[in-house]
Amino acid sequence: GHMAKAKREVSEQLKKVDVVFELVDARIPYSSRNPMIDEVINQKPRVVILNKKDMSNLNEMSKWEQFFIDKGYYPVSVDAKHGKNLKKVEAAAIKATAEKFEREKAKGLKPRAIRAMIVGIPNVGKSTLINKLAKRSIAQTGNKPGVTKQQQWIPVGNALQLLDTPGI
């Protein structure tokens, strides 16, 4: 069915990225997570982006940040709509992938941009975040046949490329 297809697509995308950005709603971090994410992402480094921080309780949020740190993730609280704290996303991605890039460097591989993808349930602000990180509007071209195959890498900052994953 639909879920199995989504799962397959995510697994395919995962092969191409170094880090996963899991986007959740800062007001309801746990219930705004996709339950199959953990199973699919498995061992990939993960940055948990708590969006809509402007609308959430700061005390609660620091508890949630600690919860995600304890799980081995790199949490960042942002307000995508107003473009707040977005610089921290790139910094967290650099931290989350440092080990992998050290290994690549040791093997003599050339330095390259970190490749990331965003996962999250609908209405957590994925499009807003992508557009703000990219500092431009990424066309919503979901209904034309064949677009899903044409994934594009969106440059973010100096060290990051974001895989535009329609509908994940």
Where are these regions (language model features)?
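N-terminal accessory targeting/assembly segments
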Residues: 1-43
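Switch I (effector-binding) loop of TRAFAC-class P-loop GTPase G-domains
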Residues: 2-7, 108-111, 134-160
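Conserved catalytic network of the ASCE P-loop NTPase/AAA+ motor domain
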Residues: 11-15, 39-42, 81, 148, ...
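Conserved, well-folded catalytic cores of nucleic-acid-processing
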Residues: 13, 17, 40, 71, ...
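Conserved beta-strand/loop subsegment of P-loop NTPase cores
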Residues: 18-24, 42-54, 72-77
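Conserved nucleotide-binding/hydrolysis micro-motifs of P-loop NTPases
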Residues: 27-29, 53-56, 81-84, 147-148, ...
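Canonical P-loop GTPase G-domain recognition
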Residues: 53-120, 138
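Glycine-rich phosphate-binding P-loop
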Residues: 115-135, 139, 165
